[in-house]
């Protein structure tokens, strides 16, 4: 905003108001194409890339706030539509031939989140099942002809190649010019040739491609062209030559270009359909499917290097350098090297890059992953390297109960396997001591403890996350292992002496050994469908995991085995969500009392009834279930200027139940809680729509104790 005020003398709101007044002064134009699909209010809808299905139907890709992208079949006579199948995130326009649809989807690699490819996909209309073509993960703009299948293949070095496959014959690979990008591919049945849409230093242009190279048909111009298709000796595409998006065609026989539509706000994605043209036309509710006769509005187009300046109001010139007039030559590069020495970027020394700090001590990893924000007086340093494969934080905090606290966390993603390092110092040393109930005195007796030292711990874990994106579904297999050491004081079980009545006779003199090792292994699998803009959670999905934890340095410590399962189901009304979860954990081996109870054991904190902590349970045949029903109650879609935007307020009603065997193995203990959560989805300080944070207020009534209240913040990182 400050740049706008400085250069034009007005604020951005005034600029937008002036722009709106200018647009209102322009002559109004009507849409030349007739509407096939009406758009609903308050559900922004986008139809893309319509294709003819005979004389009575249209196939199009549809997305709206309520549902993710899917192919729909539209009746051209009534406008009624039927879903064919859901898709992943489509990367380039689909094409149709002989009952088979071809398109490409973005798919991330199995190991690296930053590596995203474009997967070749197809679907037979007879069964409506999307399929992927193995080994074709860098494909764009697929086109099938009666005899061949062609697509554009890109390489990481910036080179594009047109690949043509005919049956079992060797593939033909047609090269494109160096330093050029391919933005479209089409095949014309009349001229029996392939055509490409090229972008290079001269602008955008259309050419015919064969084994000898690319032969220009139009001249390069700084005019955006898009969605190239061909049929009956004509090329169809979108162009902004007239000053806004309209459908154009190029007659290959007459060598003339025509604009074939007029529209109020723009027409897109023209597709020939037996003498007619299918399009999408824009208005405030989205993009709707329209059609018109192919020759109903043939407006000749005069070749030009620039589009008509239609929608841009007159502006005064800013006193800045026009980059189009700047020339950077080899001599300039040599002079720059003399002034600024080129240095190699060394990865290891640059893993740490402290970029900001905060005047409070907290764990940002726990805040993002678990929505747990534990604040203390102090400060936090945040680090992220330039390659974004290493994140770290260091904090110093203080509170009255624990004194000084120092924490360190590092995450590294650069090798596919994720490594986590954490270290802590400060607070009170943990004791794993013994206790027993003396029936004669009616009191509990506990092991004597020495004065505690400062607590410290260090841990290292490795996780291999494998992603398997299959369009509408995303599956993940995760294998992990971790080690942790702390200076916890563990009861010395070798010194136990048993007396009469099954009581420990020397409980005050058993003593402790210093140090607690924890080694864990885990595996998990999840499968979830894509979420729409208004979905609270995936409509369908599940997660299964199991973990095994043991102490390799102390055989008296019991091993812990745990299982966890979670499922997402649709609610009774659209965008309502049901979440069901269950877990089981128990201790194995280790030292056991004569009654069979294991006094030294680990506990999993997963799925403990809300209002309780891990201190309230025992890992002795522990079983728990949880049920949550979540629904939106209000969508304000407003807020305070550029400070906060409240997107949605939702309500969750939940209940938890757990049971486990008490110390004697013959008594079942049962705990439960019921309550709800009020969740506010908001965007702070002009964050993009995808970066939505949450604020949650929780209130639950546990079966033991008073009401339990909690508040948490979820960050979108």
Locate predicted features.
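A flexible loop/linker signature enriched in serine peptidases of the S9 family
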Residues: 1, 5-18, 44-45, 62-71, ...
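Outer-membrane beta-barrel initiation region
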Residues: 5-56, 60-63, 239, 296-416, ...
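Short coil/turn segments that connect the beta-strands within blades of beta-propeller domains
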Residues: 55-56, 99, 146-147, 190-192, ...
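Outer-membrane beta-barrel "beta-signal"
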Residues: 521, 625, 676-680, 706-717
